Amino acid sequence: MEPLTIGYIALPVALFLLAMRVPIAAALGVVASVGIFVIFAWRPGADFQPEYAWQPTFSLLINSPFAFITSYTLSTVPLFIFMGHISYEAGFTTDIYRAARLWLSKLKGGVAMASIVGCGGFSAITGSSVACAAAMGRIAIPEMLKFGYSKPLATGSVAIGGTLGSLIPPSVLFILYGIFAEQSIAKLFIAAIIPGLLSLFAYIVVIYIWVSLKPDAAPVPEETVTRADRMSALGRCWAIVLLFVVVIGGIYAGFFTPTEAAGIGAAASLVLGLVLGRLKTSNIGSALKETVYQSSMIFAIAIGGKLFVNFIALTGMAASITALIDGSGASVVVVIGLMVVMYLSLIHI
């Protein structure tokens, strides 16, 4: 059996496993491992010979993930996640949410809109959608329910706001994409700023339309908020603004690389929290524990993805698909449209 045939068989199997809710790391890793073994065992012009496949398969399965995980650039992932969790433990996330809530307090759906803004602010210092949704969920959902917001609106606004963590820099997703695609992470970060802000604004517009159609879903809180309260809350957001400017501004200005920026951001958030008296030993321990949990999950998925990329390279599928697209004569717009459809299909999976 030709490697290309093995690849075209394995791809739908991987998609089927994902559709069956098999963990991503397991689905990609298992399919890639079996596929690599079969390719090495099925030599051209010979029968299936598994005795020749064990050594090269295990060599690839061990060396490739090790080389990937020990990558210097990949260290940005736990560092940015740690920066986000330290900022949450220090209350910086609460500061930006409270400021947004007070400034939007008189609008219908203002608390839900504030959760979106809070997610955007938190995304700017963590880059993890999971950390963003979890942190903002603990802060915003209880408050929205207290004010009489409907549960679908309360939970939905935090869930969709959490996706900003995958778009607004420093996005972990862009870091992994940059490593896999061998692209500049700094350029990816800069390119994501405007789409991230547009997405944030679009989510707010959707909430406004929702509460306009269903006013009972978001009662306006009966509270008195003065201009002094708003300005005071806004002034307390300086820590998050400083961290974002140092990290993203430093990358954009060329002062340091994304990896160096992650280290500086993590150290700066820790120092700020300690100097301001907002962190205790238990807070740091909690941040470290959450960082280990989330980094382990992300690394497991990344290892599965790396093995699958190696498998695809062995099959020659990339060259085959490229030749197919070139030979079809399809325009760039059609190709991009097909890619969008594919991505949307994967989201539903």
Residue map of PLM features:
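Alpha-helical transmembrane segments of multi-pass membrane transport proteins
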Residues: 1-349
